[in-house]
A protein has these predicted regions:
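Histidine-centered, transition-metal-coordinating active-site segments
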Residues: 1-86, 100-106, 110-411
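Short alpha-helical catalytic segment bearing the HExxH-like zincin motif
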Residues: 87-92
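Short active-site segment of divalent metal-dependent hydrolases/proteases
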Residues: 93, 97-98
Length: 411
């Protein structure tokens, strides 16, 4: 009988999963839930190909981790089999705490608890079921293990999470800028004093990686239409929650119903087992099914927003470098309340103003160390000939104004 399972992945080809702990994790219901959650949430409103799931991403990141362990070992870095298995388990589980449309859900229904916190709660829960087999994986995930480079491979500037999602998201969206040479970067990785370093001949690959990441952020992750659909979903769920807490009857799956009809804060999420229990029952289907049914609800705010989500009648977006004036805000709200025959308070659900800040490289977070033949190291910001690092470290702030289109405004 074979000692491994082989999965064919469109991005990396054949991925080998050894039987035992790692295969048990892949088959676990908590990881299988990620097959029902899209990696890029609402980005398919812009890039119709972006239908891939968080499960596919977890497998891809696992594959890259396996390759990295092989390369680091071949360079004479001693990694115990137990450490290799633990770091592979940690990367398989790194996204287990994502809900459907993750950031939307965190901010509207999950009481502001981040997916990283939920991932850890779920790992600890799985660890109990698996009789402590994930102890080392959790230590690495929490950065409590002496070999720091293992944590850096799970969560750092050059982690396997990023190396996979840039390649994968580029592949499925068709945005070629993200198509980084992950294999080349992995070959350049090494370890010095228990920290991850990159061989000096890999500088150009790293510069390319940082630039690709920046381009993918503005073209995919922060694309104005994706931002608009996200804001629209936030407002739809916020309205649904407001109606639910007023006692209005709404269609919802049992898990979604739990979050709509109970006001939940961070403290309760941590202390009530019901929160986690219901959270792991949620996936994209709960949200889409609710939106379909809410499209015909008697509440004009909820039904208009839900229909907009279902039929891709999304908010109009303006991206500016300065904030909106009070007068402009009032003008938009007046038009919307006339258009839908609703009051100003209700009209606010059809306007969203936010700013987004993004810089690709923060030295203080996790610098990328370049190692030279003589053993000395320098940060990429100093080692790079290109001036792009100073550009990448600069904060870029954009203001997004999203609002309901007027009736005579096309797409």
């Amino acid at each position: 009988m074979s000692d491994r399972k082989i999965i064919n992945d469109p991005v990396f080809g054949f991925i080998n999963i050894p039987k035992g702990l790692l295969y048990d994790i892949v088959c676990h219901p908590l990881l299988q839930r990620l097959t029902r959650i899209k990696q890029l949430g609402l980005s398919s409103a812009v890039y119709p190909g972006a239908q891939h799931t968080r499960f596919q991403h977890s497998l891809g990141a696992f594959h890259l981790m396996s390759e990295t362990i092989k390369h680091l070992t071949a360079k004479g870095n001693f990694i115990f089999d137990s450490e290799a298995e633990a770091v592979q388990a940690a990367i398989l589980l790194h996204d287990i705490g994502h809900g459907p449309f993750s950031h939307v859900l965190e901010n509207t229904l999950a009481g502001g608890v981040s997916h990283e916190e939920i991932s850890l709660m779920l790992m600890e829960r799985m660890n109990k079921d698996m009789k402590g087999q994930l102890n080392l994986a959790i230590q690495i995930f929490k950065d409590e293990y002496p070999k720091k480079f293992l944590h850096q491979l799970v969560s750092g500037q050059l982690d396997m999470d990023r190396l996979d999602y840039l390649r994968r998201d580029s592949f499925y969206t068709g945005v070629s800028e993200g198509n980084i040479g992950s294999a080349g970067i992995i070959k350049m990785l090494d370890v010095k004093d228990d920290h991850l370093v990159v061989e000096s001949k890999g500088i150009y690959s790293i510069e390319n990686f940082l630039m690709s990441r920046r381009l993918m952020y503005w073209q995919v992750y922060l694309h104005k239409t994706s931002v608009a659909s996200e804001k629209m979903l936030v407002n739809t769920l916020t309205r649904a929650k407001e109606l639910a807490l007023r006692g209005v009857e709404l269609f919802a799956s049992p898990a979604l119903r739990f979050f709509l009809y109970h006001p939940i804060d961070k403290k309760e999420f941590y202390n009530s087992p019901d929160c986690l229990e219901n959270f792991i029952q949620l996936d994209d289907n709960d949200i889409w099914t609710a939106l379909k049914v809410w499209s015909n609800h008697s509440d004009v705010v909820l039904s208009t927003l839900s229909r907009g989500m279902i039929n891709r009648k999304l908010f109009k977006v303006e991206v500016t470098s300065s904030s909106i004036t009070k007068a402009r805000k009032e003008e938009i709200l007046s038009r919307i309340s006339k258009q839908l025959n609703i009051n100003k308070k209700e009209a606010k659900y059809f306007l969203s103003i936010s700013s987004i800040e993004n810089n690709m490289y923060k030295k203080e977070d996790d610098s990328i160390e370049i190692i030279y033949k003589d053993g000395s190291t320098r940060d990429i910001a100093k080692a790079s000939d290109m001036l792009n690092i100073s550009l990448l470290s600069r904060k870029v702030k954009k203001y997004y104004i999203c609002y309901l289109r007027s009736e005579n405004d096309g797409h």
